[in-house]
């Protein structure tokens, strides 16, 4: 369940803090299921500086373990999120991406600071260079945007 995933990620932060990790530099990124979790964690964990969600489902999920959806938590985002999506993703319709963009504009300050990039001709998994849907141009651009996003949201001094 989502609650367990959030608790597990929180436990990772505790562990990192106890083992020399810099908790002023907490960022998150995830792909597919992890992209969905990235959105949810950005609404859950105030220690996040920013996050990047790669083609994570935004609306209705895959059953009773996923009762909360990213579109439902935009008003609770505690960190700005960059969402990277493909126009040809059969599992995440462009209409869902547009609905999320509209919701972000009405959400928290962090939601309004969030962005979504929709890649033309890109499918779900466009970053996975070991899969047939790999799109080199979108993957390279997405990676550069991911790194820039994290640099754009530095830890507090």
Where are these regions (language model features)?
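N-terminal cap/leader regions of alpha/beta-hydrolase-fold enzymes
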Residues: 1-157
């Amino acid at each position: 369940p989502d609650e367990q995933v959030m608790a597990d990620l929180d436990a990772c932060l505790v562990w990192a803090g106890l083992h020399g990790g810099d908790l002023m530099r907490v960022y998150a990124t995830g792909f597919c299921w992890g992209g969905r979790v990235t959105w949810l964690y950005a609404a859950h964990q105030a220690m996040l500086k920013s996050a990047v969600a790669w083609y994570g489902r935004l609306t209705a999920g895959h059953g009773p373990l996923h009762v909360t959806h990213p579109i439902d938590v935009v008003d609770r985002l505690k960190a700005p999120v960059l969402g990277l999506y493909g126009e040809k993703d059969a599992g995440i319709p462009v209409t869902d991406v547009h609905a999320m963009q509209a919701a972000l504009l009405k959400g928290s300050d962090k939601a309004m600071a969030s962005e979504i990039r929709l890649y033309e001709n890109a499918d779900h998994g466009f970053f996975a260079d070991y899969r047939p849907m790999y799109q080199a141009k979108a993957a390279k651009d997405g990676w550069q945007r991911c790194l820039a996003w994290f640099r754009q949201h530095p830890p507090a001094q």
